[in-house]
Amino acid sequence: YFSIMLIFIILVFFLITQNSNATLEDNFMWPLDGYTYISSYFGYRNSPTSGASTYHSGIDIPAPEGTNILAVCSGTVTFASWGAGGGYTIVVENDDIKVSYCHVSPNFIVSKYDTVVAGQIIANVGPKNVYGIINNPYKDSLGKPTNGATTRLPFTFNNKKRWFSGKSAKLFQYALKQK
């Protein structure tokens, strides 16, 4: 039973240089140990809340309040505060990517300018009254997500905790939609 919906929004702002030979897939971690269900994918969707955008710039992962959130990648914390539309938000950036963790607990584990490594605990899933998703229509009367998202991750996510194999927003969107 999930007591809360973590809305994990990944804003993909790639700054990868054209001559880079490094692969990204070995540098990324899944953000929630034991929680792999994606209830809402990157891209266009039916908005789960009235007035919200139909374009979703990240993925939603349901997890219980207090669940540890792990850094997807190594980098520097560039934002740790209240963010419009994202509730309490932490942003981690490196030379390749910028990742936003939205709707986290207001009791931040990291601060702006901290350096983090992939897999490090940076936050916890926040209480729903912090960011106003009370009466959120993500679940039906049986507690199941209502947006038709798959209950298993695409093959690019199945290598234990390894995550993300694309190098562009289009590949990222495609990978998330594969079943």
Q: Can you annotate each of these PLM segments?
A:
Residues 2-13:
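Single-pass alpha-helical membrane anchors
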Residues 15, 20-88, 95, 117-118, ...:
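Surface-exposed, glycine-biased beta-strand/turn segments
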Residues 23-31, 37, 62, 111-120, ...:
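Acidic, glycine-rich catalytic/binding loops that coordinate metals and/or anionic ligands
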Residues 48, 102, 109, 167-169:
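Short acidic, gly/pro-rich beta-turn/loop elements at beta-sheet edges
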Residues 54-56, 71-112, 128-157:
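Zn2+-dependent peptidoglycan hydrolase active-site motif and core
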Residues 67, 99, 166:
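Glycine-centered loop/turn positions within well-structured domains
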Residues 124:
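Short glycine-/small-residue motifs
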